Regions:
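Aromatic- and glycine-rich peptidoglycan recognition patches
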Residues: 11-13, 17, 27-30, 75, ...
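...with weaker cross-activation on analogous glycine-rich loops/strands in unrelated enzymes
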Residues: 54-119
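Cysteine-nucleophile amide-bond enzymes
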Residues: 1-17, 47-53, 68, 75-85, ...
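Intrinsically disordered, low-complexity N-terminal regions enriched in serine/proline/glycine
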Residues: 10, 24, 40, 53, ...
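N-terminal capping segments
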Residues: 3-57, 95
Length: 136
C-alpha cells in the first residue's frame, strides 16, 4: 500500500525491514571521517534495509520521519539492537543535528563513530537525543 503523509512523505507502509541489511550497508559505505552528510548516508541505509524512503531532510527532521515509518522511540538505557537509529537535536554550530545507525558494534553515520556522542558540542551542552527502533 502506498501512503502519502501530510508532510508529503511517500513510502510503502507494509514493507520488510531488515535492520541487518541497513546496518551492513551503513558500515560498508562509511567514510574514513565525517563528510557532513549523516542524514543522506543513514537514509541510504534505511532504503537498503527495505524501506523505500523518497524524501531527504536534515538529521533532526528524522525525529518526525521515523515514527511515520513505524519506528518507535526506545529508552536511552535500553540495550541496543542492530538497526537502532539515534537522532540528535541541533545545537551550537551543529544546526542540522546528527543521525546514526547501530551496527551491533558501533554507531555509523557518514563515518564509523567511536562513541554515541561525536562532538563536544553535544557532550558539553546536554543535548537532547532519541533512539528509534522498528520491529520486523
Amino acid at each position: 500500500m502506498v501512503i502519502i503523509s501530510a508532510s508529503g512523505l511517500l513510502y510503502l507502509r507494509h514493507c520488510e525491514w531488515s535492520p541487518e541489511e541497513a546496518a551492513r550497508y551503513a558500515t560498508e559505505h562509511a567514510e574514513k571521517k565525517s563528510v557532513g552528510m549523516c542524514a543522506l548516508y543513514v537514509r541510504k541505509a534505511i532504503i537498503a534495509g527495505g524501506i523505500p524512503l523518497y524524501v531527504g531532510g536534515d538529521a533532526w527532521s528524522y525525529k518526525y520521519t521515523l515514527p511515520i515509518l513505524n519506528f518507535h522511540q526506545v529508552g536511552k538505557k535500553s540495550e541496543r539492537e542492530v538497526g537502532d537509529i539515534v537522532v540528535f537535536q541541533p545545537i551550537g554550530g551543529r544546526k542540522y543535528g546528527h543521525i546514526a545507525i547501530w551496527n551491533g558494534k558501533q554507531w555509523v553515520s557518514d563515518f564509523k563513530q567511536r562513541n554515541l556522542i561525536v562532538h563536544s558540542d553535544y557532550l558539553n551542552n546536554g543535548c537532547e537525543y532519541a533512539i528509534y527502533r522498528r520491529d520486523r
